[in-house]
Design a protein with these regions (language model features):
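Carbohydrate-active catalytic/glycan-binding domains of CAZyme proteins
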Residues: 1-179
């Protein structure tokens, strides 16, 4: 199939007591009509409560997945890879160039189109001790596992106006190049 996508949930098989929470793989030939690739989740380790990303990486020639998990009580990001979108490596936590313990939600990680040897991400930093503020930050990597994080937000709460509070300042996945 030309298109693949994630769906988060649990198995709906009648009477299934071993149902696991996780990411389900879908496929579509046309991008309009979708079907499950298998009836059980393909990734079950993680929290899956924010933007779960999967994309084909033409440099590594495999699919990459980035999703959320709890790392010693702190919200963080995991990565795993697959050759077929069904069989994934064991997810591992991202590693950072600093020792900051920051809650990270959505990750918006992708290859940077103008320098494809780089990964770029805009994770949402959650600050529960500061009125549950959220702000996107910048991070980059050469291998998709080891990331450099910048401390300053990419978009502060003051720009544009009225972006204060929980769940009010996120960046979505993708970059748009302007002429």
């Amino acid at each position: 199939a030309k298109y693949k996508a994630w769906g988060r949930g649990r198995s709906l098989r009648p009477g299934d007591k071993s149902s696991k929470h996780g990411l389900f793989a879908f496929q579509s030939a046309d991008g309009l009509h979708w079907k499950l690739m298998q009836e059980t989740p393909v990734i079950t380790e993680g929290a899956f409560d924010s933007q779960n990303l999967a994309f084909y990486d033409p440099i590594q020639k495999q699919y990459c997945d980035y999703h959320r998990w709890f790392n010693q009580g702190v919200r963080d990001i995991m990565v795993c890879t697959s050759n077929d979108f069904l069989n994934w490596t064991k997810p591992v936590g991202l590693q950072y160039d600093d020792a900051r313990k920051e809650h990270l939600y959505t990750n918006a990680i992708q290859r940077y189109p103008r320098a494809p040897h780089f990964f770029i991400g805009f994770p949402t930093r959650y600050l529960p001790n500061q009125g549950q503020r959220v702000e996107p930050i910048l991070m980059t990597s050469r291998d998709g596992l080891h990331f450099k994080r910048w401390a300053e937000p990419v978009i502060p709460e003051t720009a544009p106006k009225d972006r204060r509070g929980n769940r009010s300042n996120y960046m979505t996945w993708g970059l748009v190049q302007l002429p």
